[in-house]
Amino acid sequence: MTDYVVGDIQGCFDELIGLLKKVRFNPDTDNLIAAGDIVNRGPKSLETLRFCKSLGKSFQMVLGNHDLHLLAIAKGVKSPTSKDTLHDILKASDAQILLDWLQQHPLLLNIGEYTIVHAGIPPQWDLNQAELLAKEVQSALLSEQSGEFFTHMYGNEPSIWDSTLKGTDRLRLITNYFTRMRFCTEVGQLDLQNKNSISANFPYKAWFAWGDRRSAKSKIVFGHWAALKGMNCGENLFALDTGCIWGGPMRVMNLNNEEYTDYKISP
């Protein structure tokens, strides 16, 4: 049995299938874990969603910002943008079944010694705290008041963690850390404006670049940051978003041996 973690799929269904064939993925014996953003921007989000759901217990995922965006649109609290490619899902006969299934997933998964998140874990949280805070958001997603969560999900403030935060501000910041973060200060103040670079001006650094971050001894697998192109980010860090949606390959990581496999459809 092999556990595979795949980076951002974003509706690139053909590349996903090609990649799984390349590693000889067998859903009867292997597991596929997605590091978030399985939908949006690519041409086949509906096919991707249906396929992942069809894998049953052989599939797990953490939610990314695009997955949450789809759910917010479906709830009627957000309108699609011109860049979104979610129309087919929203109009599908099985839309509600797919959306309900998607909404059940967490923001953080532990698979053996590996922790999978979409964007990262801020430097001021250790793994135990991250797990507890991820569960707070998951509880909101699973509650009958989940529409309230989506109504207040969007926004860049507050931008720094304070344990006394409550309500929608608290949930928004936790969600932003797990699904949108790239750069932050040493104490975790977010810069959500800088999206396309791999460097930032003082006092900001990549979240994983802070040497004293409290999760440094944990093996963290993440996606989200296509500009990194899957670069080596340091010990215990595994970046899987290789920018498939932008013309790069799609990447999968074998958790049994930490080997990467990339796949790209030739033009």
Q: Which role fits each region the language model picked out?
A:
Residues 5, 34, 61-62, 115, ...:
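Residue-level marker for buried hydrophobic side chains located in beta-strands
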Residues 46-49, 54-169:
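Active-site neighborhood of divalent metal-dependent phosphoester bond hydrolases
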Residues 1-51, 55, 68:
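N-terminal active-site segment of His-dependent metallophosphoesterases
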Residues 8, 37, 64-65, 102, ...:
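Divalent metal-coordination and catalytic microenvironments
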Residues 131-267:
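Acidic, His/Gly-rich catalytic cores of divalent-metal-dependent hydrolytic chemistry
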Residues 2-10, 114-120, 239-240:
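Active-site-proximal beta-strand elements of phosphoester/diester hydrolases
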Residues 11-14, 40-42, 66-72, 124, ...:
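Active-site environment of divalent metal-dependent phosphoester hydrolases
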